[in-house]
Amino acid sequence: MAAEIHSRPQSSRPVLLSKIEGHQDAVTAALLIPKEDGVITASEDRTIRVWLKRDSGQYWPSIYHTMASPCSAMAYHHDSRRIFVGQDNGAVMEFHVSEDFNKMNFIKTYPAHQNRVSAIIFSLATEWVISTGHDKCVSWMCTRSGNMLGRHFFTSWASCLQYDFDTQYAFVGDYSGQITLLKLEQNTCSVITTLKGHEGSVACLWWDPIQRLLFSGASDNSIIMWDIGGRKGRTLLLQGHHDKVQSLCYLQLTRQLVSCSSDGGIAVWNMDVSREEAPQWLESDSCQKCEQPFFWNIKQMWDTKTLGLRQHHCRKCGQAVCGKCSSKRSSYPVMGFEFQVRVCDSCYDSIKDEDRTSLATFHEGKHNISHMSMDIARGLMVTCGTDRIVKIWDMTPVVGCSLATGFSPH
């Protein structure tokens, strides 16, 4: 069912510890059980499985439960050993797991959505199960009564969710590329603000309640850090993935962001450096360097008897420039550009070699990652995806041993 991998330790890359195989369809969620050698998985094959590591080093299913509908999302609350599973039919089901993780009892079904559930969060303090779905809404239900408390609709599929337990703020990402910040109440909610920055659907969110930072990953292959706590609208762009960003995890202790994309890319971003905001793109009717007209500026084209040019933008200064004045390419990691992007000639000349030093490390997960989660205390990561495989990684070589020991170098 599962192979134990003995990789030769590499000082600079994640170490693959185990590979779990056995699901008959895509694995939509995999969660590490804290303080246990165990993983909980949910799959499109309609099963929830709890895998425990045996003496042989292999993971075997101690619980194998078949659902009525494909499993699309999952949340696990370790202190109360409660599992919440969202399904393709819109229902959320609650289970309680025994102390030895060998038995799972059904508790109740929540009629949360009319369509596929995309994300679930359980709040013990309020006894709410909060979820988003492809019926374009976020709902919150009482786990004591099983009743629907409230629901808020969006204009497109709600795809991901984060929740601040202290303030009862919910962050919901959707397929239009928008993130909505809501204040949830017992039977109502209010929209605080909407965040717009992505050019593709938002696939994942991560909220850090300590620094009050929100991270979002999207199908435009980019990550945005929203400084909610700073109250100045500061955003940082991180571009280094070559495919849709599927999962995020911020390590508060070491100020690192771990991200995974659907092509198997695993990135670790150093957020403990002074980064710069990417500029807003400026609009102009002519090149802001050589003043040649752009192709829609018919008057200047006629007056100067010249052909109009295509408009481009320098990623460093944001100016509208022609192709001739922006012929060079450069990475600029301090602004989040880990690979080469278009810059104008004057900005290219201003970028020093040390400015091109990468502020992230990139690794290969070697499978199509659709979901990732971490046990930050142990420096472990689990990835799963459309190839039906679950992989368990030791991330301490790339994020530092300080995680495992609780020691921060800062």
UniProtKB/Swiss-Prot annotation:
Record remark on domains: The FYVE-type zinc finger domain mediates interactions with phosphatidylinositol 3-phosphate in membranes of early endosomes and penetrates bilayers. The FYVE domain insertion into PtdIns(3)P-enriched membranes is substantially increased in acidic conditions. The FYVE domain is required for its function in regulating TLR3 signaling.
Record keyword Repeat present: yes
FYVE-type Zn finger ranges: 281-352
Subcellular location as annotated: Early endosome
Protein name, per record: WD repeat and FYVE domain-containing protein 1
GO BP annotations listed: positive regulation of toll-like receptor 3 signaling pathway; positive regulation of toll-like receptor 4 signaling pathway
GO cellular component: cell junction; cytosol; early endosome; Golgi apparatus; intracellular membrane-bounded organelle; nucleolus; nucleus
Function: Positively regulates TLR3- and TLR4-mediated signaling pathways by bridging the interaction between TLR3 or TLR4 and TICAM1. Promotes TLR3/4 ligand-induced activation of transcription factors IRF3 and NF-kappa-B, as well as the production of IFN-beta and inflammatory cytokines.
Binding residue positions for Zn(2+) 1: 287, 290, 322, 325
Residues that hold Zn(2+) 2 according to the record: 314, 317, 344, 347
InterPro entries tied to this protein: G-protein_beta_WD-40_rep, WD40/YVTN_repeat-like_dom_sf, WD40_repeat_CS, WD40_repeat_dom_sf, WD40_rpt, WDFY1/WDFY2, WDFY1_FYVE, Znf_FYVE
Main location: other
GO molecular function, one term: 1-phosphatidylinositol binding
Binding partners and assembly: Binds PtdIns3P in vitro with high specificity over other phosphoinositides. Interacts (via WD repeat 2) with tyrosine-phosphorylated TLR3 (via TIR domain) in response to poly(I:C). Interacts with TICAM1 in response to poly(I:C). Interacts with TLR4 in response to LPS.
Sites bearing Phosphoserine, chain numbering: 408
PROSITE patterns: WD_REPEATS_1, WD_REPEATS_2, WD_REPEATS_REGION, ZF_FYVE
UniProt cross-references to SUPFAM superfamilies, sorted A to Z: FYVE/PHD zinc finger, WD40 repeat-like
Ranges occupied by WD repeats: 22-61, 66-105, 112-150, 153-192, 197-236, 240-279, 364-403
Record's keyword terms, sorted: Endosome, Metal-binding, Phosphoprotein, Repeat, WD repeat, Zinc, Zinc-finger
Keyword Repeat assigned: yes
